[in-house]
């Protein structure tokens, strides 16, 4: 009896693309900070979050965790040839400004900083106020 020979799927190595400019999307929530770096078309080059970098619980919402996440995302994006970025901020978390500072200090040239925080035109009812 002859067994069907199946080929093992080989893991494809990501090719290093030379992308000179891109967009950095920083989503800073009260619980976490997510940094995504894309090319101008919107294809993701690299991403990092405070949780991916190794922080958990309340430490994820700190400004330092956002700094480390932004440095991690910038390092992997710069290895694919990224030099100049536009920064798009979303949210009101603690890691907004510190993430932008980390991107500048890691060697990326920031051309534009945009604030795209979604503001409702009196849409859904907000959750109940927290009483401490």
Swiss-Prot record:
It comes from Chlamydia muridarum (strain MoPn / Nigg). Located on the platform of the 30S subunit, it bridges several disparate RNA helices of the 16S rRNA. Forms part of the Shine-Dalgarno cleft in the 70S ribosome. The keyword Transcription does not apply. GO terms for molecular function: rRNA binding; structural constituent of ribosome. It comes from the Bacteria. HAMAP family: Ribosomal_uS11 (MF_01310). The keyword Repressor does not apply. GO terms for cellular component: ribonucleoprotein complex; ribosome. Keywords: Ribonucleoprotein, Ribosomal protein, RNA-binding, rRNA-binding. The lineage of its organism: Bacteria, Pseudomonadati, Chlamydiota, Chlamydiia, Chlamydiales. The gene is rpsK. Transmembrane segments: none annotated. Belongs to the universal ribosomal protein uS11 family. This is Small ribosomal subunit protein uS11. Signal peptide: none annotated.
């Amino acid at each position: 009896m002859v067994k069907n020979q199946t080929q093992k799927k080989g893991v494809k190595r990501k090719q290093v693309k030379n992308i000179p400019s891109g967009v950095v999307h920083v989503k800073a929530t009260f619980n976490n900070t997510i940094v995504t770096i894309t090319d101008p078309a919107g294809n993701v080059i690299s991403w990092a979050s405070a949780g991916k970098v190794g922080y958990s619980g309340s430490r994820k919402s700190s400004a330092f965790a956002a700094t480390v996440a932004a440095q991690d995302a910038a390092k992997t994006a710069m290895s694919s040839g990224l030099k100049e970025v536009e920064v798009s901020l979303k949210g009101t978390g603690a890691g907004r400004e510190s993430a932008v500072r980390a991107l500048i200090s890691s060697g990326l040239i920031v051309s534009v900083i945009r604030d795209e925080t979604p503001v409702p035109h009196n849409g859904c009812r907000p959750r109940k106020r927290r009483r401490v």
